[in-house]
A protein has these predicted regions:
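Gly/Thr-rich phosphate-binding beta-strand-loop-beta motif of the actin/hexokinase/Hsp70
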Residues: 1-2, 117
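Residue-level marker of positions within ordered structural domains that often coincide
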Residues: 6, 80, 126
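Substrate-recognition/cap helix-loop segment adjacent to the acidic, metal-dependent catalytic center
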Residues: 71-90
Length: 129
């Protein structure tokens, strides 16, 4: 999570299942390629949801911007912490933007790292305003 200003949030999940070869090659090696202050132990999905809820609690009107619909779906799936149970988050707005000619990965300092990709997306969107 990268706000316009303020503290960033970077979470990595504990995963013991099989990984697609592309993820193994292009994502996993770079999971901890973030500022040292943001490197943390892998979290369970439930702990990650609670950390995300705590982070969002500090925002009166959170707006999540994505350039791919699946990003919104995965974000929302993370909030589900059990059957019929979701993390306690404030009301959240989502905006999916189409950015012809812009590639998050191509503009990211560390392609396919969620933090760096989010920074690239944020910086590009702010440059359009």
């Amino acid at each position: 999570m990268v706000p316009d200003d303020g503290e960033e949030l970077y979470i990595t999940l504990d995963w013991e299942g099989p990984l697609e070869a592309w993820v193994e090659r292009n994502v996993v090696p770079y999971l901890d390629t973030v500022p040292e202050s943001l490197v943390a132990a892998r979290m369970s999905r439930a702990d990650a949801a609670r950390a995300l809820a705590h982070y969002l609690a500090g925002d009166d009107d959170p707006l999540i911007i994505a350039d791919w619909p699946e990003d919104v779906a995965l974000f929302n799936a993370l909030l589900v912490i059990g059957p019929g149970i979701m993390a306690e988050v404030p009301e959240i707005s989502f905006r999916v933007v189409q950015l012809p000619g812009f590639s998050t990965a191509a503009n990211s300092k560390v392609p396919h790292n969620a933090l760096h990709d989010a920074r690239a997306l944020r910086d590009h969107i702010l440059s359009l305003e």
